């Protein structure tokens, strides 16, 4: 089946196909920070940003010689900023600075020409803080940005005029923009007037706008630097979008043939009758309002909890794995935002099969299928209590055996 991404590249200026699997990539080496001085690692490296199948954005650095990926960080919108270090005058040094805590990762450009430096920096910030719409365009790196250009009524009518009813249903279906909040990319005066006063199923589309709303906020870097980097061999970087693929199938409406232009009223009627997932109609629970920093503080003070959470912290140089870092991470605005996004995704009722892959109890999977966040949390809590009872029972049995031996 043709993906909805094939409907757009020919309509949006500048879109093109490519085989690159990364949103943005460029050659750069790592640097180590000691005191107020950064020292370059002379290995040939590659910085790249990738969106995986779970829609998460990864900022990565790998050794180009060995192919080993040494840094793989999951980044949420407004989590960090990538900027040049102006204090360094002997090389082209950039820093990935996290807004929560003191994490900083330094890199030095290995591209021989400087003309793309500013563009690479801009694209890194763009994709980290305004990632492509999850699942909407089959992995198209620039889909969300292209669709935003169609927000005007004229753009929408031009788009619809080139689509058959079959393509339109495909566009707003589960694999197109009808996914969780997918139509948010078309927001604008044109869509507002199109939808009128109630055509949009708000309960099924309220969650994903958070992932598109973050903006880059400049911050300062005060460390002094002494670097003498050496440029390496150039390599081309590209941002990709899919090439048009012809769609097949007959039209689904008897009133309008596939060759007849589609009007805005047609789309309005379809949107008004779209089915909302069963879990989205009930009362939704936002985990971010439950797991507040005040509630988490005494839990995070538990040494056993800290030990269990430590392996899940980001790893890499200049990224300490400490109890303080756990506190900073779980109480950060970015983590709260991630909780809200997870709550909305879970409430959609479409993630039961995904949860089953993690070996969760049947009660939790059933709650995920129903989109019941509260029941999901209770099922997980009951599972932990059951595991604790089994562990306590085993410990008690071992103690009794030891006593009998004495």
Curated annotation (Swiss-Prot):
Keyword Repressor included in the entry's annotation: no
PROSITE patterns named among the record's database cross-references: DEUBAD (PS51916), PRU (PS51917)
UniProt feature, compositional bias: Low complexity: 198-259
One GO CC term on file: proteasome regulatory particle, lid subcomplex
InterPro entries per UniProt: DEUBAD_dom, Rpn13/ADRM1, Rpn13/ADRM1_Pru, Rpn13/ADRM1_Pru_sf, RPN13_DEUBAD, RPN13_DEUBAD_sf
Keywords: Cytoplasm, Nucleus, Proteasome
Compartment annotation: Cytoplasm; Nucleus
Residues covered by the Pru domain: 18-131
Molecular-function GO term, any one: proteasome binding
Family matches, as Pfam families: Rpn13_ADRM1_Pru, RPN13_C
Region (Disordered): 198-260, 379-406
UniProt entry tagged with the keyword Cytoplasm: yes
GO biological process: proteasome assembly
Domain DEUBAD: 277-390
Biased composition (Basic and acidic residues): 386-397
Biological role stated in the UniProt entry: Component of the 26S proteasome, a multiprotein complex involved in the ATP-dependent degradation of ubiquitinated proteins. This complex plays a key role in the maintenance of protein homeostasis by removing misfolded or damaged proteins, which could impair cellular functions, and by removing proteins whose functions are no longer required. Therefore, the proteasome participates in numerous cellular processes, including cell cycle progression, apoptosis, or DNA damage repair. Within the complex, functions as a proteasomal ubiquitin receptor.
PANTHER family for the chain: ADHESION REGULATING MOLECULE 1 110 KDA CELL MEMBRANE GLYCOPROTEIN, PROTEASOMAL UBIQUITIN RECEPTOR ADRM1
Subunit annotation: Component of the 19S proteasome regulatory particle complex. The 26S proteasome consists of a 20S core particle (CP) and two 19S regulatory subunits (RP).
Stated family: Belongs to the ADRM1 family.
Protein name, entry field: Proteasomal ubiquitin receptor ADRM1
Source species: Gallus gallus
């Amino acid at each position: 089946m043709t993906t909805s991404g094939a409907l757009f590249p020919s309509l949006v200026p500048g879109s093109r196909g490519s085989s690159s699997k990364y949103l943005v990539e460029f050659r750069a080496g790592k640097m180590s920070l000691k005191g107020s001085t950064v020292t370059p690692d002379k290995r040939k490296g590659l910085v790249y940003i990738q969106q995986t199948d779970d829609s998460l954005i990864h900022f990565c650095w790998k050794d180009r010689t060995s192919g080993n990926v040494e840094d793989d960080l999951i980044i949420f919108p407004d989590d960090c900023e990538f900027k040049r270090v102006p204090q360094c005058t002997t090389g082209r040094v950039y820093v990935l600075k996290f807004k929560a805590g003191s994490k900083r990762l330094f890199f030095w450009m290995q591209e021989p020409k400087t003309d793309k430096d500013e563009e690479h920096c801009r694209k890194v910030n763009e994709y980290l803080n305004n990632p492509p719409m999850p699942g909407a365009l089959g992995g198209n790196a620039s889909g969300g940005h292209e669709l935003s250009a169609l927000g005007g009524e004229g753009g929408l009518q031009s788009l619809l005029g080139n689509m058959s009813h079959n393509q339109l249903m495909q566009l707003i279906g589960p694999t197109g923009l009808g996914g969780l909040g997918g139509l948010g990319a078309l927001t604008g005066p044109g869509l507002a007037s199109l939808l009128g006063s109630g055509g949009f199923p708000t309960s099924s589309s309220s969650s994903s706008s958070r992932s598109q709303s973050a903006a880059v906020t400049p911050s300062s870097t005060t460390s002094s630097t002494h670097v003498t980097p050496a440029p390496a061999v150039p390599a081309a970087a590209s941002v990709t979008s899919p090439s048009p693929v012809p769609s097949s199938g007959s039209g689904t409406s008897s009133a309008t043939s596939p060759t007849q232009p589609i009007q805005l009223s047609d789309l309005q009627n379809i949107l008004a009758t779209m089915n909302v997932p069963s879990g989205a109609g009930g009362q939704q629970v936002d985990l971010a309002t439950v797991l507040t920093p005040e509630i988490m503080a005494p839990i995070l003070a538990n040494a056993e909890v800290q030990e269990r959470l430590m392996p899940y912290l980001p790893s890499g140089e200049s990224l300490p794995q400490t109890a303080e870092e756990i506190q900073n991470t779980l109480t950060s605005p970015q983590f709260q935002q991630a909780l809200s996004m997870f709550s909305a995704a879970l409430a959609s009722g479409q993630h039961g099969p995904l949860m089953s892959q993690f070996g969760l109890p049947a009660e939790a999977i059933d709650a995920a299928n129903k989109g019941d966040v509260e029941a999901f949390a209770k099922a997980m809590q009951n599972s932990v209590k059951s595991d604790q009872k089994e562990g306590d029972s085993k410990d008690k049995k071992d103690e009794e055996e030891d006593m009998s031996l004495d």
